[in-house]
C-alpha cells in the first residue's frame, strides 16, 4: 500500500495498532524569520494568488518556509523533497518532505528520518494525517528505535498542524499555527528541528 492509500488516522491506527491522543506538547518562543524571507513572502502574498493550486502553495510558501528553518540546522540534517521512503509493501511511498540526520556518506544517502511533512491535498487534513501517520510508522521502523520521536507536519500552506509518534502512540498537537502567526509557526519549526535528534 502506498502512503497515500491511508485515508484517515483511524484506518492507519487499526492497521498498525497505534494508540492516539491529543495534547499540547509544543512550547516554543516566537522567532521572526530573516528579513529577506519576509520580504519574499510579503511580495508573494500581495501579488500572487498563492492558495489556488498545490504547485503555488508548494513553491511559494511550504518549501521556502521549511528550507528557511532547515538552514539553521544544515550541518546536522539532510532536507529531502519527494525522497522515496520504503519499509515494506504496506509502508512505502514518497513523502512530500523529509528531514533526516545527515549521513557521513554525503547528501545522497538517507539516514535516520526524523520529520515528515505532508501537504494536505485540497485542504483535506483528515487524509493528510492518515498518510502522515503511515509515513511516521515507516520512518520509525527504518530508524529501528521506537523510543526516538518522529515528528509529522500536515499543512495546506496556510494552516500547519503537528504530531509525533513515540513507540506505539501518536500524539496530535492541539494547537495549529497559521501564516498570520508566522513568528509562532517559525518558532515551532525551529523547536522541532532543535529537539528532533
Predicted ranges, named:
Residues 151-159:
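An amphipathic alpha-helical core segment
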Residues 2-4, 16-21, 26-149, 161-197:
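A short, conserved, highly charged catalytic patch centered on acidic carboxylates
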